[in-house]
Amino acid sequence: MKTIKEKVKESFEMLKTEFGYKNAMQAPKIQKVIVSSGVGSIKDKKKIDLVEDRLSKITGQKPARKGAKISIASFKVRQGDIVGMQITLRGARMYDFLDRLINLALPRTKDFRGISSNGIDGMGNYSFGIKENTIFPECSDEELKDVFGMAVTVVTNVKNPKETKAFLTHLGFPFKKVETKEIKEKPKREKKPKAE
């Protein structure tokens, strides 16, 4: 099976006829992958450490703690309180994470039928959510009691949603297959002339 890195190198040859690339510098590339997660209870120090530990196991890199930008009295959040974690992956770690995500983690999701392509924006970014961190093999069965979700953003150099989807499909992202149903037209009724 080819790795994501090998597929990225092949992307120029695979997509040049469809999108009219003239040289290899126009070929799409993945620039970075951002993985982020909220910590839930900000007062629970154990939960913050737990999320940090598991994200570092999943990605192979220590996450940066993100503090609240403003104080919100109704949520009892003060400016600077830790509310989430974020990791930016580049290079070899990025490709390793994507390989594990596509080939191991996503197929382990319960009732998995593909990921939605609605998260593709006009700037070449694709964002999607993962409901449970336990789909990754790094999170063992002993750790099932504290499950959290995460958001993954794949940043590419493509500036067109159609091109982005074709590139990510070539890399092996399992997008949902949209079934198009034929819409039957209702027969038109003939209008009866009004009686005078």
Regions of interest found by a model, annotated:
Residues 1-196:
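Ribosome-associated RNA-binding proteins
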